[in-house]
Every structure is written in structure tokens, then in C-alpha cells.
Amino acid sequence: MNYVGQLAETVFGTVKELYRGLNPATLSGGIDVLVVRQRDGSFRCSPFHVRFGKLGVLRSREKVVDIEINGEPVDLHMKLGDSGEAFFVQELDSDEEDVPPRLCTSPIPWGGLSGFPSDSQIGTASEPEGLVITGRRKRRRRRKPRRKEDVVDSSSEELEAGVESELTLLEKPTPESPSAQEEEETSSQPKDIHPYSDGECTPQANLSSGDLMSPKSDSELELRSLEPSPLRAESHMQWVWGRLPKVAKAERPEFSLILESMAEAICALPEEPSPSSSPSEAGVDTLSPPVLHPGVRADKFHPAVEAHCEETAVDSPLAAPESKETKTQNSRGAGHPPATKSWSWTTPESHTPSGHPQVSRGKGSLKRNQHLGPSDIYLDDLPSLDSENVALYFPKSEYGMGARRWSEPSNQKLLESPNLEHIAECTLDSVDKIELSLCGGLADNRDISLEKFTQHMVSYEDLTKNPGLLDDPNLVVKINEKHYNWAVAAPMILSMQAFQKNLPESTVDKLEKEKMPRKGGRWWFSWRRKDFPAEEHSSQREKAATRKQQGEKTEVLSSDDDVPDSPVILEVPPLPSSTPGYVPTYKKSLRLSSDQIRCLNLNEGANDVVFSVTTQYQGTCRCKATIYLWNWDDKVVISDIDGTITKSDALGHILPQLGKDWTHQGITSLYHKIHLNGYKFLYCSARAIGMADLTKGYLQWVSEHGCGLPKGPILLSPSSLFSALHREVIEKKPEVFKVACLSDIQQLFLPQRQPFHAAFGNRPNDVFAYRQVGLPESRIFTVNPRGELIQELIKSHKSTYQRLGEVVELLFPPVVRGPSTDLASPEYSNLSYWRKPLPYVDFEALA
């Protein structure tokens, strides 16, 4: 029994360690890279597929991947994306065509001086030569500790007054002062938020989005409303060989489509309430005034349908309790209703919470579930409401506060005098004035003054006479007291005019980064400078007066001591002269150019490469791979792993990890003999990228009579573990990845010659993939779990790896290196050209 217990403990420990290595939250891996030296001395390479896990604590300034080749660091860095993928950043030329938005990125953060703002805040701008910058030393904010009694009180009263506190927030939505909002923004957001960095947004967008928080990753963007299943989360990320990951459009399940169609059909049917039912139970009759629901746009409002849909949702026998996630989102987002209405089956509450605002009428009062927000309101009740109730039904931003709000001043009219005239006035005046001017100056290092903007103002007559002024580089568009060029302002105006929605903050920031001219001498953090021009002084005075009127306060960082700030003087390197209107654009890339590869100083054959990310909390996370340098005239043999080297697909993953040898007999010696004849081996498997270390360790562990498998690049699927298993086990389509991968490798050698000489597999899918890359059937071999080797040209003939090793010289003749005795034109040799032709023989006459 002791032996059985020890064996069970060993198996359990091995499986536990294996699971830790395959956990999607900690999964990291790198696929080997193949570099091919061309005939002319240039280089081509396969994509650098590297993926890191454990990205929960990474910030923008830490998303830099360092690279070491053969133990030496190289002057080449990668950047991390939202899903953990690493990529290179390349600057586009001005004449290069536009790239898709998902491939655009910010430059790799620059590890600047310690103690100063990070690279993403500084960007790529520099000060002119000889400029002396004076500033204050950076002070660390002292965090106020929370009092212990506050924690005790909040924890003791949380369960008793949880619902009442939320309803109190709904009942009294008093706007906070700007200083309080700034304090909340500062406390709720980290300090190292960088603009234009992947996976993050500005503090304004993060804070003001309410329950519609901006996602940090692409998978989170698509799967926020779905159940957090690892398989479902990974299946919506599309990972393709040679390309960066992107969000795949999730197919809507058939059951949800049926439910939605049933709900629409039920809501469309008219239903007359029974005479005995009260208005609070039967809903609103058809003769009653239209009901205005909070958070719903008036132009998309249908009174009868909305009222009946609510009644159906509450009284339906199919009602089911809400999930905790839904309740949490509804309770948080009650103050800010979402832009779109979603169907949910809820159970009616048996009591009305105290403090819930209700609108009374002669026929009775309307009651709603506490999770459905405030009750409905009639249009003829609007003149009698106070500002607090109006704020519930007319929120400041109906599209989510993450968008840029143009109409903040005009929305205040609803709170001051909520009547129908002001509602119509605010609807028409929902957008501030958009002013045009030909003053220019967007690329200058000082702001545009009001006098200069007004002096070159564009009127309606000017635009009608000369519409071409929109292409004028001096055109400045003023929206919400901010200045933009036409390339940035046009999408903003078009979005508001066509869709009645503002562009998200991240989109506007991206447009500013790509389309706005970079300011010549502006430093991104506000240090003091001397000798301001008069125009700049006036603009600063105007800004200060405006901020004072609006009640904004500049946040003052509390210092550790009372010593006055001492100035810091920096000598900034000179900025190379460039065109003021040019803004560099950066794109993501997985491949290196020939010049970049040449700078790596690769050795012939295998080169060990280490990708590392250093974080503040996790230390250094490393990912290892190998870069193989081959020549354009090498001959390559392709080999599958699961079922070809191992005896079966499923057990080939598990048994080798438990120490069991599960390889075919004779395959190691056969591959070794083929390698001695001058052939290169390429291992191609549909395993996931996270299993790269595990797969490489297994191939190095395989040994037979002291002979191991030849070294070669191990090409795996760049997708996640669950996606790879789903494609290989459930869909049974591993050839989708193999065709794309092998075709890409083939392009590295072409148009010189066909690189592939033979291939080994175990499935018809492998045969299909090998045929797609031009391999003849005479050199395609498949093996079954019994170890029987079949040549696709003669399927009836069965052999083994041992027998094929005996005739390896015939099927895999030695590769001749260097000069050979072959003639350039054999048809002009003495034997072929000077000999007499053979006499014609009539075979029919002989028959």
C-alpha cells in the first residue's frame, strides 16, 4: 500500500505541476524563428511569435521586452500588447499607405531619467538646442491612512443599509464640485497612466465611464457581458500565424436569437388590461399620456411597446432570478443608465424600498423593481418636478460618460427649469458652437490666443464662396474651447451629426496623436520657462481666468517636508530639424527587416534567444526560444510531433510528462541518418504557443541507443491553449494552421527553389497540408498508432521506421555541397548532342 500511495502522490504532484505550467493566467511561450540567408546576402525571417502571461500588474512603462541572443543583450526591443503578445514597433514613412487602426501603436517607452515623468508622458518630443528648463522637484504624494473606526463602521452598516444608500444616491444626484471630482479622479486612478499606450485610456475616460468602464484587453471588450469561462474568453481571440491577435466576431447562440424573437413578438402584441386590475398592476392603458422612461432617448421611444414589455418582463412565468453580476451592474449603473436597453427576466419585488422616488397620479402610483431604476414619468408631470427628479430622468450624458461631452453647459438648463420649452431648447442646442479660423499656429509652441483666432474667423459666406478652405493647412476648428485641425475635427463633427454620438476619448486622443502637428518646443509636463512672448502671456492669463470662473483648482501635491521647492536645471539635447506638420505614425510588426537581422550577428544554425519583461511587483519574466539561421539552398524535412513521433495524439501529451517513453521505435535513428545526409528538420505541430517549453523539452528528452532527434525550429500555433485544443480535438482541423505556417516558411526560400524534400505525419489532415506546399506523394509518409509506415504514393505497401532507415540513402541521398560535376546543360553533352538518333520502330507492324 505504501508503494501505491507513493505512486499516487507522484502522479498527483506531476499533474499539479503540469497544470500550473498550462494555466492560462500564467501561460507564456515563444515560437522558434527561422532566418534564411538569400543568394544576394539579404535575410528573411519568420514571424516572432512571443506571448507572456501574468499581465495583471503590468503598466505601460513596463511593457517593454528586452532581448538577449546567445547571452548577449542586443539593441532591439519589443512591446507588449493587451493580450500578452510581443511585437516590434516600426515607424512608417510619410508616403506609406495607411495601416488598420488595430495595427497602430505608440512608440516603445523610453527609459528616461529616474524620478521624472515616464516616457509615455514625454513622448518623442524634445526641446530645441540650448534650452534651459527650470522646474520643481517631483514630490511624492503622501497617502492618507484610513481611520480604523471608519472601516468598522462601514463594514457593520454595509449589509443593513446597502440598498438604502444606493437609493439615496439615486434620489440626490447632487453634482460634486470640480475640486472634489479632481480629487476622486486622482485617488481612483494610478499615477502612471500614459497617453497613446496600448490597453489603457486617459484618467478622464476611465473615471467618467461609470459602469461602462473602458476595457483593458480585446477579449474583455467582447466578453464583458458573457460568463467568464476560460474557453469562451479564449475562443473569441483570433490568433493566426504571422499576424497579430484580433477580436473575432462572436457568433450569437441560436437559443438567444429565439428568445429575442419571442420577446419582440410578445411586445408587439396589443393587450387590453382587465377592468378589475389597477393601473399599477396592469401597466399603462392606451389612452394614457406617453410614458418617458429614464435613460432612454426620446427619438427612439415607443410608449405602448415599452410599457407592455416591462409588464411582460415582470409578470412572465419564465421569470428567473438575476445573477449577482447583473445585480451589481444594475445597482452601480442606476445613476447612469446605459445607452442600449437589454432584455432581462427578473422577479418582482414584494415590497417597495423606502426612499425610492415615485411620481404620484390620481389613478395610483407606479412601482418598479429596485434594480430597474426609478419609476416612469408622464410628460404632463414635468412642470411640477423639482431639479432632483429631473436629474434622474435626464442624465447629463446618455451615451456613457466615456465619450467627450460637448453639451455640458447647455444641459444645466434642464436642472434649472425643467419644462418642455427648455427641453426642446436644450435638444436643439445640444452641441456647442463650432468655430472656424484661418489663424494657424497649431504647430507653434504656444497656444492660440483669442484675438488671433477672432481676427481670422471664417464666416458662413466665406465657406460658401470658397469651400476649398477646408484643405487650408492654417484652418483651425474650435470645439468646446479646444483647437483641432480639420483632420481631427471632421470625424468628431461627422459622428455627432450622423449618429448623434460623440467619439470616445481614446479615439479623439488617437486622432490628435496621428493627425495633429507636433508642437515645436513644447515640453509635455508643465515646468516654468522664462521669456514668454506677450501673446503667450495673454493666452495664459485668459486660461487662468477661465479656470477661475469654472471653479477648477490646480491639484497641489503634498510634500514630505516644508522646505521650498528647489529648481532643477536640465540641458536638453538638440532636436533635429523636421517638418512641423509631420506626425510620425508607428505600427506593430512581427518581422524584422534584413538590416535589423544583420545587426543581430547570428551564428550559423541555432541561436538561443531570451525575451524578458521586468515588472515592479513580479520581477523578471523570461521566455526562451531559438533562432535558426539557414541558407537558401538547404533542403528541409517536415515532421509532425503528436502521433508521428509519439504513438498517439492524446497520450503523447500526458505520458511523457509522467516519465513514460511513448515514442515510435526507430524514428530517432531514422531522423538522425537523414540529418547526417545534410537535411534540415522542421517540426510543425498544432500545439499552443504556451506549450513551447514543454514540447522542446520533450524533443530533447527523446533518445534511442544514445541518439537524439536532430535540432530544428519547432513551429507551434500562436493561439491559446483552449483554442488550439478546440481546433485539434473538437473541430479536427489542424491543417488550417499547418497550411498557413508551411506556406509562410516556403516563401522564405522562394523564388530560389522548393525547400521541402519530404514530410512525416499521421493523419489525412497532415497529407492535405503537405500537398498544399508542393510536396509529391512519393515523399509523404504517414504512420498509424501501430507503428506501420505508409507511403502515400503506394498506400497498400506498409513498412516501419526501421526498414525505411535501411534504405535511407535511396530516398534521402546525400546533399551535395559546393561545386559539382553536373553540367549546366546536359542536352549539349557528347552523349546527348553528338550521338545518332535511335531508329524508328513500328510496334504495330511487329505485333
Curated annotation (Swiss-Prot):
InterPro entries documented for this protein: HAD-like_sf, HAD_sf, LIPIN, Lipin_mid, Lipin_N, LNS2, LNS2/PITP
Positions with biased composition (Low complexity): 270-281
Segments for region (Disordered): 97-232, 270-296, 312-372, 535-567
Regulation of this protein's activity per its record: Inhibited by N-ethylmaleimide.
Compositional bias (Basic residues): 135-146
Motif mapping: DXDXT motif: 640-644
Polar residues compositional bias, start-end: 341-357
SUPFAM superfamilies: HAD-like (SSF56784)
GO biological process, one term: positive regulation of transcription by RNA polymerase II
Compartment(s) of residence: Nucleus
EC number: 3.1.3.4
Motif, LXXIL motif: chain positions: 651-655
GO molecular function ontology, one term from the record: transcription coactivator activity
Biased composition (Basic and acidic residues): 535-555
Keywords in alphabetical order: Fatty acid metabolism, Hydrolase, Lipid metabolism, Nucleus, Phosphoprotein
Domain of life: Eukaryota
Coiled coil ranges: none
Catalytic activity line of the entry: a 1,2-diacyl-sn-glycero-3-phosphate + H2O = a 1,2-diacyl-sn-glycerol + phosphate
Required cofactor(s): Mg(2+)
Motif Nuclear localization signal: where in chain: 135-144
GO cellular-component term (any): nucleus
Function of the protein: Magnesium-dependent phosphatidate phosphatase enzyme which catalyzes the conversion of phosphatidic acid to diacylglycerol during triglyceride, phosphatidylcholine and phosphatidylethanolamine biosynthesis therefore regulates fatty acid metabolism.
UniProt free text on domains: Contains 1 Asp-Xaa-Asp-Xaa-Thr (DXDXT) motif, a catalytic motif known to be essential for phosphatidate phosphatase activity.
Family: Belongs to the lipin family.
PANTHER family hit by this protein: LIPIN, PHOSPHATIDATE PHOSPHATASE LPIN3
The protein's name in its UniProt record: Phosphatidate phosphatase LPIN3
Organism listed in the record: Mus spretus (Western Mediterranean mouse)
Gene: Lpin3
